[in-house]
A protein has these predicted regions:
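N-terminal pre-domain/capping segments
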Residues: 1-103, 127, 131, 158
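Generic structural signal for well-ordered alpha-helices
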Residues: 23-30, 51-59, 91-95, 116-123, ...
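Acidic/histidine-rich catalytic cores of soluble enzymes
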Residues: 9-11, 37, 71, 121-227
């Protein structure tokens, strides 16, 4: 298993557009801690970045022996905003970004039925460049619940379109995330995200879900007990 460190760890929780650490510094940390890759997001480089900056970012990773495991090419996608699915309407710049970084996996966002056809078209365009598309298990999206996620995967029906398994978001929505769900998702899993939290109605953080309304929780370190039971995962 190859481990990748998301540049999310170097963003402010309340603002995914602001990096707290330079890419060079973060890459050095990843190497020191035994990671094999970085998961790139627009807080470091994205479609808004110049070609020179993207190329330089790729060089910095390569110089440290790090791969780019996945690319999230803009801000609306990780923010899960209404603008998130717009990338599917013009996937070309995102494919260019991934190609320059030597990455074959691109994260996308889907929030309504109309996005399904655009996902098919984008997947077909990505396939021509040997790039895969994936959607994260995420609140307020077509991938909020397990059954609906599988329905959408079958509706898109492209071999290069898959899933980013993420148990914390599934738990926020009241869904199962254990071995049974993993077995159902297994043919479609392209990537795995792991983060930890403890559900708490009075918690410091709150996220809106379609399934359960607002859900309170506390963020905790990945190794801390009392949150997501990662052992069976």
């Amino acid at each position: 298993m190859k481990l990748s460190l998301s540049v999310r760890v170097a963003e402010k929780f309340s603002s995914k557009r602001e990096a707290n650490m330079a890419l060079t510094e973060l890459a050095d940390v990843a190497v020191e801690e035994g990671f094999h890759a970085l998961c790139m997001r627009a807080s470091q480089v994205g479609i808004q970045s110049s070609a020179e900056d993207v190329t330089e970012a790729g060089r910095r990773l390569e110089a440290r022996g790090l791969a780019c495991s996945m690319v999230t090419g803009d801000f609306p996608i990780p923010e899960n905003s209404e603008e998130g699915p717009q990338a599917l309407r013009n996937i070309g710049p995102y494919l260019d970004l991934a190609s320059t970084l030597g990455c074959n996996l691109l994260r996308i966002c889907m929030k309504e039925e109309a996005d399904i056809e655009w996902a098919r078209r984008s997947a077909d365009e990505a396939a021509e460049r040997k790039i895969r598309l994936a959607h994260q298990c995420h609140t307020r999206s077509l991938f909020e619940l397990v059954d609906r996620s599988l329905e959408v995967l079958h509706q898109v029906n492209r071999p290069n379109f898959g899933l980013i398994y993420e148990p914390a978001n599934l738990e926020l929505c009241g869904g199962d995330f254990g071995p049974e769900t993993i077995a159902r998702f297994a043919p479609h899993i392209f990537n795995v995200y792991l983060q930890n939290h403890r559900l708490n109605p009075q918690g410091a953080s709150t996220l809106e879900t379609w399934a359960r309304g607002n859900v309170g929780f506390d963020q905790i370190p990945i190794w801390e007990a009392g949150g997501i039971d990662l052992e069976p995962v």
